């Protein structure tokens, strides 16, 4: 097993280990296709794609595990709760961008205040849209609403 796990780039002072999982071409390809690392995406599209994914999966826990679970308004309460959390997250992203990016001479547009503002705006629109899409799916397709009940009851 020791021959499979080595210091990253044979430098023991880096602090990372090179394992078959972390240095495989499959792992690098999978991580390279995530919107955070994909080349050529504008900050707005990057935020939109990340926001859609987060908005889509945030509604489920609020719907199935929230205080109004099992009632007729659980799905609506879950949707509104997820939108509330999205607004809080967007506010935090905006505050982070305002204090972190004061220079505008970076090569990466996401590392500037304007680029981070575009990312934040894309995140807000994408997350609310993803949450709304999940709400519409759950409200209009009954088999999706009851699919996860066996996990929590």
From Swiss-Prot:
Keyword Methyltransferase carried by entry: no
Any one of the GO CC terms: chloroplast thylakoid membrane
Transmembrane annotation, as ranges: 73-93, 119-139
Organism for this UniProt entry: Porphyra purpurea
Topological region Stromal: 1-72, 140-153
Highest taxon in the source lineage: Eukaryota
One Pfam family per UniProt: PsaL
Subcellular location field: Plastid, Chloroplast thylakoid membrane
UniProt keyword annotation of Thylakoid present: yes
Lumenal topological domain residue ranges: 94-118
A single BP term in Gene Ontology: photosynthesis
Protein name: Photosystem I reaction center subunit XI
Family: Belongs to the PsaL family.
Alphabetically ordered keywords of this record: Chloroplast, Membrane, Photosynthesis, Photosystem I, Plastid, Thylakoid, Transmembrane, Transmembrane helix
Membrane topology: Multi-pass membrane protein
């Amino acid at each position: 097993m020791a021959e499979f796990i080595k210091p990253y780039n044979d430098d023991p002072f880096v602090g990372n280990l090179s394992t078959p999982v972390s240095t495989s071409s499959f792992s690098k390809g999978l991580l390279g296709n995530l919107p955070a690392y994909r080349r050529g995406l504008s900050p707005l599209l990057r935020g939109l794609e990340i926001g859609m994914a987060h908005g889509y999966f945030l509604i489920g826990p609020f719907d199935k595990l929230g205080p109004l679970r099992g009632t007729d308004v659980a799905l609506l309460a879950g949707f509104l709760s997820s939108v509330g959390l999205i607004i809080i997250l967007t506010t935090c992203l905006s505050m982070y961008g305002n204090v972190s990016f004061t220079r505008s001479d970076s090569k990466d547009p996401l590392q500037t205040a304007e680029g981070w503002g575009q990312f934040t705006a894309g995140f807000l629109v994408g997350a609310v849209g993803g949450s709304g899409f999940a709400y519409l799916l759950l409200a209009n397709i009954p088999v999706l609403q009851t699919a996860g009940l066996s996990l929590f009851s």
